[in-house]
């Protein structure tokens, strides 16, 4: 297919127009007085103030401009992936850096030296933000971060409560509910999505579950079908303590092994429940190993030279309580050694860092959460589907922002942290020439998020940014009340990870855009006009 090209200044200006189209759409949603963009697709419209959600929907007709829009979309997506929030701030900064940078390139500055200056300035500001950040572990601080992100006090308190229960590595998920309002469900310990093999193995018929108090836990990697394999261990369990229940986790339990369990359950000889191991292949092996670490068990596997008919009680794990329903199994308070559990957690974290696959990362994070802390489910309900989606979005953003805050700490919010941090650039970092100009580009661009937080409710943006620049660190403009003051005390705070990502990602794209000399796009094929109505009918005389 034929390609069409654009060069030099024309190419960069086309990219800038695309950047502006997307950024102008997104930036109306920054700040507490944000306007909301309605995105109509199939089905009901989506009402959102989430930058990345809006950015993903924007396609610009002109192919050159669309390249610029896609670059900013990449900024928003990357910021969302790293910090989970701050996507609108990142988009506003991308637009400002591109505008200031291109102005200087047009005036004859070297794009390569400008890029050098921009990169040095961003690194210095990022360092200053980290040095300023205040660590948070207070429940009230966590609630403030979440409430600010979701713009809802109740959400803030709920997320703080959830994080308090599951710890900072625990899973907090959001589910849609049929009721109105918000509710929090908590599962302590480890849960996996496999239930009992047979209804006959239930201990509580009314609640349709099996509850095992202080049970033995047998973890077997393969299938168990022959009773000859299982019997020696069952006899040892009965001799040791006939009243102690047994949970068997295996790839499957079938044939005479399963029927023997059922017969003994009915006779009341002993209480045993069998569940299938979760997952498949290597993931199943890893999850069984996680359970073993948590419960103090040893996984029975011929790969490591262990045969089921030759092992004793030493391979069994325990837990304070296990609840098995039709669909899932929850292990509460396993006595696994703390240092072994921590080593396993560190290993999974390293695997998360090293994987390129989103699916693998998600599954590893689930494993991490199951080991590191329980699982909290926030159930959200609303009157309409549109409102439900919007609330769910806000909740997910708030959870991400809260995780980021716990990880690296907080700085004052409302765009003020950047305004204060760029003071480290006042001597242009000792740079000269075009590199110094690159530093100045970052200094000018950094005030834009605060400017638009003020402009959206109709205030004079630059007047407010210059006032905030004269205040001390931590002080700023509270757009919700229209007052200046200590933002951290007022609960207007941002996770430093969000603020850093919202500056670093746009700077990287802006640097690329400034050094662009040629754009190559595919030429659209002209569609042939359809044949006229009756042209195929000839005249026959």
From Swiss-Prot:
Record keyword Signal present: no
Compartments it resides in: Cytoplasm
Keyword field: ATP-binding, Chaperone, Cytoplasm, Isomerase, Nucleotide-binding
Binding site for ATP: 29-32, 85-89, 414, 478-480, 494
EC numbers on record: 5.6.1.7
Enzyme type, top EC level: isomerase
One GO CC term on file: cytoplasm
GO molecular function: ATP binding; ATP-dependent protein folding chaperone; isomerase activity; unfolded protein binding
Primary localisation category: cytoplasm
Record-linked Pfam families: Cpn60_TCP1
A biological-process GO annotation: protein refolding
Catalysed reaction, written as an equation: ATP + H2O + a folded polypeptide = ADP + phosphate + an unfolded polypeptide
PROSITE patterns in alphabetical order: CHAPERONINS_CPN60
Keyword Zinc-finger (UniProt): no
Function text: Together with its co-chaperonin GroES, plays an essential role in assisting protein folding. The GroEL-GroES system forms a nano-cage that allows encapsulation of the non-native substrate proteins and provides a physical environment optimized to promote and accelerate protein folding.
Protein family according to the UniProt entry: Belongs to the chaperonin (HSP60) family.
Subunit structure: Forms a cylinder of 14 subunits composed of two heptameric rings stacked back-to-back. Interacts with the co-chaperonin GroES.
NCBIfam families membership: GroEL, PRK00013.1, PRK12849.1, PRK12850.1, PRK12851.1
Protein name: Chaperonin GroEL 1
Organism: Streptomyces lividans
UniProt lineage: Bacteria, Bacillati, Actinomycetota, Actinomycetes, Kitasatosporales
């Amino acid at each position: 297919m034929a390609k069409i090209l654009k060069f030099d200044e024309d190419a960069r200006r086309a990219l800038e127009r695309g950047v502006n189209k997307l950024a102008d759409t997104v930036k109306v949603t920054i700040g507490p007085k944000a306007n909301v963009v309605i995105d109509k697709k199939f089905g009901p419209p989506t009402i959102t103030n989430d930058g990345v959600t809006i950015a993903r929907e924007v396609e610009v007709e002109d192919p050159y401009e669309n390249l610029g829009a896609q670059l900013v979309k990449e900024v928003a997506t990357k910021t969302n992936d790293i910090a989970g929030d701050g996507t609108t701030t990142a988009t506003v900064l991308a637009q400002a850096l591109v505008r200031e940078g291109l102005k200087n390139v047009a005036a004859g500055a070297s794009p390569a030296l400008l890029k050098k200056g921009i990169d040095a300035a961003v690194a210095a500001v990022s360092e200053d933000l980290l040095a300023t950040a205040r660590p948070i572990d207070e429940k009230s601080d966590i609630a403030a971060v979440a409430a600010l992100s979701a713009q809802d006090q109740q959400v803030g308190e709920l997320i703080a409560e959830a994080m308090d229960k599951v710890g900072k590595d625990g899973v907090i998920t959001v589910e849609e509910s049929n009721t109105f309002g918000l509710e929090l469900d908590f599962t302590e310990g480890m849960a996996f999505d496999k239930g009992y093999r047979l209804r006959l193995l239930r201990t509580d018929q009314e609640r349709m579950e099996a509850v095992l108090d202080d049970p033995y836990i047998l973890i077997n990697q393969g299938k168990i079908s022959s009773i000859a394999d299982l019997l020696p261990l069952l006899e040892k369990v009965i001799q040791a303590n006939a009243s102690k229940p047994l949970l068997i986790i295996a790839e499957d339990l079938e044939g005479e092994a399963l029927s023997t369990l059922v017969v003994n359950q009915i006779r009341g000889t002993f209480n045993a429940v069998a569940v299938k191991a979760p997952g498949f292949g290597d993931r199943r092996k890893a999850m069984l190993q996680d359970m073993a670490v948590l419960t103090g068990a040893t996984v029975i596997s011929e790969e490591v030279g262990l045969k089921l008919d030759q092992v004793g009680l030493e391979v069994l794990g325990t837990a304070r309580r296990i609840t098995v329903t039709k669909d899932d199994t929850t292990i509460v308070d396993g006595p696994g050694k703390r240092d072994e559990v921590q080593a396993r957690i560190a290993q999974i974290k390293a695997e998360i860092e090293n994987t390129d696959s989103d699916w693998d990362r998600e599954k590893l994070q689930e494993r991490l959460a199951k080991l590191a802390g329980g699982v909290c489910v926030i159930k959200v309900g609303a009157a309409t589907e549109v409102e439900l989606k919007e609330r769910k979005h806000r909740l997910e953003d708030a959870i991400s922002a809260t995780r980021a805050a716990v990880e690296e700490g907080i700085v004052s919010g409302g765009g003020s942290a950047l305004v204060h941090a760029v003071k480290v650039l006042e001597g242009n970092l000792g740079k000269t020439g075009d590199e110094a100009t690159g530093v100045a580009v970052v200094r000018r661009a950094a005030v834009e998020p605060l400017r638009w937080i003020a402009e959206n409710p109709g205030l004079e943006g630059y007047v407010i940014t210059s006032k905030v620049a004269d205040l001390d660190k931590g002080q700023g403009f509270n757009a919700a009340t229209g007052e200046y003051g200590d933002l951290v005390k007022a609960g207007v705070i941002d996770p430093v990870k969000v603020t850093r990502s919202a500056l670093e990602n746009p700077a990287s794209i802006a640097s690329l855009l400034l050094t662009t000399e040629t754009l190559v796009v595919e030429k659209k094929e002209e569609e042939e006009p359809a044949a006229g109505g009756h042209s195929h009918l000839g005249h026959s005389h």
